[in-house]
């Protein structure tokens, strides 16, 4: 006979700072042992200290938990590479930074495991779309797929 499955009480999606998670209201609402979670999370993310790390926490009725660490959001990576604090207020009229195609490809390769893109080219277009919405230009890359023919 298969072992009984634990009863899930909550699934929470949080953005925490790598290596610096602390017990607080966001974690308290999940209903887990906060000290145990923060110690484990900080140990696993100490190499990403200071970066925003999305985490999905599954809390069970017996107060145990599982969690999955995701990759840093594209917007944070773009701001970090472009060395800006925020995107453009009106990205259609304003450009706040320009990054190289190689820098964008680096982000695409890093994010590929969490994206729905099938290859680097599709991931690069997704990164370009996010960059465009922030007022960041990627040299030599369009957010749109070029049509063949015509």
From Swiss-Prot:
Pfam families: Ribosomal_L11, Ribosomal_L11_N
Top-level taxonomic group: Bacteria
Cross-referenced InterPro entries: Ribosomal_uL11, Ribosomal_uL11_bac-typ, Ribosomal_uL11_C, Ribosomal_uL11_C_sf, Ribosomal_uL11_CS, Ribosomal_uL11_N, Ribosomal_uL11_N_sf
The keyword RNA-binding is annotated on this UniProt entry: yes
GO biological process per UniProt: translation
Changes after translation: One or more lysine residues are methylated.
Molecular functions (GO terms): large ribosomal subunit rRNA binding; structural constituent of ribosome
Record bears the keyword rRNA-binding: yes
A cellular component term, taken from the record's GO annotations: cytosolic large ribosomal subunit
Alphabetically ordered keywords of this record: Methylation, Ribonucleoprotein, Ribosomal protein, RNA-binding, rRNA-binding
Cited PANTHER family: 60S RIBOSOMAL PROTEIN L12, LARGE RIBOSOMAL SUBUNIT PROTEIN UL11M
Family: Belongs to the universal ribosomal protein uL11 family.
Function: Forms part of the ribosomal stalk which helps the ribosome interact with GTP-bound translation factors.
Assembly information from the UniProt record: Part of the ribosomal stalk of the 50S ribosomal subunit. Interacts with L10 and the large rRNA to form the base of the stalk. L10 forms an elongated spine to which L12 dimers bind in a sequential fashion forming a multimeric L10(L12)X complex.
UniProt-recorded name of the protein: Large ribosomal subunit protein uL11
Species whose genome carries this gene: Ureaplasma parvum serovar 3 (strain ATCC 700970)
């Amino acid at each position: 006979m298969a072992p009984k499955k634990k009863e899930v009480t909550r699934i929470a999606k949080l953005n925490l700072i790598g290596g610096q998670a602390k017990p607080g209201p966001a974690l308290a609402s999940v209903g887990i042992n906060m000290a145990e979670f923060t110690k484990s999370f900080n140990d696993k993310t100490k190499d990403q200290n200071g970066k925003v790390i999305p985490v999905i926490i599954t809390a069970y009725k017996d107060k145990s938990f599982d969690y999955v660490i995701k990759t840093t959001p594209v917007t944070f990576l773009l701001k970090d590479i472009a060395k800006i604090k925020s995107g453009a207020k009106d990205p259609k009229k304003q450009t706040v930074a320009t990054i190289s195609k190689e820098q964008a490809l680096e982000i695409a390769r890093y994010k590929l495991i969490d994206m729905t893109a099938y290859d680097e080219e599709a991931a690069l277009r997704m990164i370009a779309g996010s960059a465009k919405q922030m007022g960041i230009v990627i040299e030599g890359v369009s957010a749109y797929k070029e049509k063949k023919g015509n």
